[in-house]
């Protein structure tokens, strides 16, 4: 209600401009008042910024978005005032308020939780270089809430390509990896994990990579990844346990084969030679896991 007069005046000015540009009785278009009307719109331009700021402070985020949006639309539709043009020419600067206007309009739309406003506004804001990390994070959150995995992936990939792989963009990279895993694209997931490791070699990444190699039955690579994880953090009980499980699973597979042996003597010999060594290999890993975390190991 506070800015109803400002909005109403803008509507009337637009209507007046439209009427002034209609052809006369002779079919000729000869605007009489357009210059004055546009000047009046220019005079009101900054008021929309002020209205946006006050609406934002009052937590009326939708109204703040609308006001900033009008602030951005006016120069697109009606150009900028002669006075403003002169100021910019003299200073030799670009008017950065439009960059900030797009940014704040996008944030206001995001906070309002109106996805239909927020997603296009955020996509417009990322065309500038101002605080793009926040813009990508907001977009990612909205796409995640909508369970839109195609756009989640696209926005994460764009963020990583634009800002490089670093601690700020790590979560985008992990999101891409998780989407690959969910879609059973294990090799792509491993390739992206390698990029994450190159940027920040965390033991957790090696652990995930080891599990992915297990998925594709590459136990040697899985063990190498788990060993690397433990080099970086020897207190990861679940990784010690995971390594024990690889040998335990091998023992189980061997026992399935050995159970087919009919001769008792042959069976006992095979068990001694093929299964027990694997259990003996698994045991120290489980013991280590238990010593670190007796509850969960």
Stretch-by-stretch model annotation:
Residues 1-62, 66, 70-99, 249-285:
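Short coil/linker segments at helix-helix boundaries
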Residues 16, 71, 91, 125, ...:
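Canonical positions in the second alpha-helix
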Residues 19, 74, 128, 162-165, ...:
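Structural marker of alpha-solenoid helical repeat scaffolds
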Residues 51, 105, 139-142, 159, ...:
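Structural register within alpha-helical repeat arrays
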